[in-house]
Amino acid sequence: MHRAGAAVTANVWCRAGGIRMAPRPVIPVATQQRLRRQADRQSLGSSGLPALNCTPIRHTIDVMATKPERKTERLAARLTPEQDALIRRAAEAEGTDLTNFTVTAALAHARDVLADRRLFVLTDAAWTEFLAALDRPVSHKPRLEKLFAARSIFDTEG
């Protein structure tokens, strides 16, 4: 779980414009749904079609400690003038400095890349621990058995 005093933020993927790089407060799902319904009611134009709105389709949760860690590592990159101008304009549009913008963007992309990995390399000790966890006997879980015995909303009639 989160440490006491830690702030929880979310980056939200949107259909209309990619990822929002600056950390934003997490909005509860019920509040998001209510706001979406209100926006849909208000955005129906003369065509009867709702206006394009940004719907959260994926959340990335970051936990930021209240006391920042000491940063000792450096990262440098060579850019073309066009790349530099584009990144600077994007950082300005987000209302953040260039360093924070690039680090946040790089970290978000790194998390996405590593989350999709299919192959994990383990040390011998980690592999032994993993095999031991697989070989442990199954414990009896009555609530789980009850859940699996119940009819699912995805079951078809027939």
From Swiss-Prot:
Stimuli inducing this protein: Part of the probable tacA-tacT operon.
* Listed SUPFAM superfamilies: Ribbon-helix-helix
Question: What Gene Ontology terms for biological process does this UniProt record contain?
Answer: regulation of DNA-templated transcription
Checking InterPro entries in the record gives: Ribbon_hlx_hlx, TacA, TacA_1-like
Its family remark reads:
Belongs to the TacA antitoxin family.
Share what the entry says about its subunit structure, partners included. Forms a complex with cognate toxin TacT.
- What does this protein do, in the record's words? Antitoxin component of a type II toxin-antitoxin (TA) system. Counteracts the toxic effect of cognate toxin TacT. TacA-TacT both represses and derepresses expression of its own operon.
According to UniProt, the name of this protein is Antitoxin TacA
Could you tell me which species this protein originates from? Mycobacterium tuberculosis (strain ATCC 25618 / H37Rv)
